[in-house]
């Protein structure tokens, strides 16, 4: 007879924490481009699947980004601040692009399940 393992269920992550971990995973996988110019270049070259902005990004930066790449790829605001995201990027960055299709899909799904 097989032995049953009654391990306690892992608690679910908060949506913002799950998104933070997904962005961190993108960085570790080498599928995260950071900074306005690098993101714009990745989008123009067709490498970016998703573009995300920090919640405290400058409105002018977001406007410039939408004007430059808004018709080529989705630009979605994240509920995470630049200070929180600095733990991933080592410096405050407002604009991120995901260059892997499956990781972009993961981040996209988490963006729409997290409270904004």
Residues of each region from the PLM?
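Short, compositionally biased "basic patch" segments
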Residues: 1-20
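N-terminal first-folded block
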Residues: 17-50
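Positively charged, polar, low-complexity stretches
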Residues: 28-29, 36-42, 55, 60-85
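Conserved beta-strand segments of the P-loop GTPase G domain that flank and frequently precede/overlap
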Residues: 52-54, 97
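Short basic, glycine-rich beta-strand/loop surfaces that mediate nucleic-acid
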Residues: 72-111
């Amino acid at each position: 007879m097989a032995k049953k393992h009654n391990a306690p269920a892992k608690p679910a992550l908060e949506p913002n924490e799950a998104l933070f971990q997904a962005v961190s995973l993108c960085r570790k996988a080498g599928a995260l481009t950071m900074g306005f110019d690098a993101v714009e270049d990745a989008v123009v070259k067709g490498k970016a699947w998703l573009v995300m902005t920090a919640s405290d990004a400058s409105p002018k930066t977001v406007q410039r980004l939408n004007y430059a790449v808004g018709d080529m790829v989705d630009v979605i605001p994240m509920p995470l601040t630049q200070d929180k995201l600095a733990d991933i990027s080592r410096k405050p960055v407002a604009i991120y692009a995901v260059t892997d299709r499956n990781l972009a899909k993961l981040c996209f799904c988490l963006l729409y399940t997290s409270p904004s």
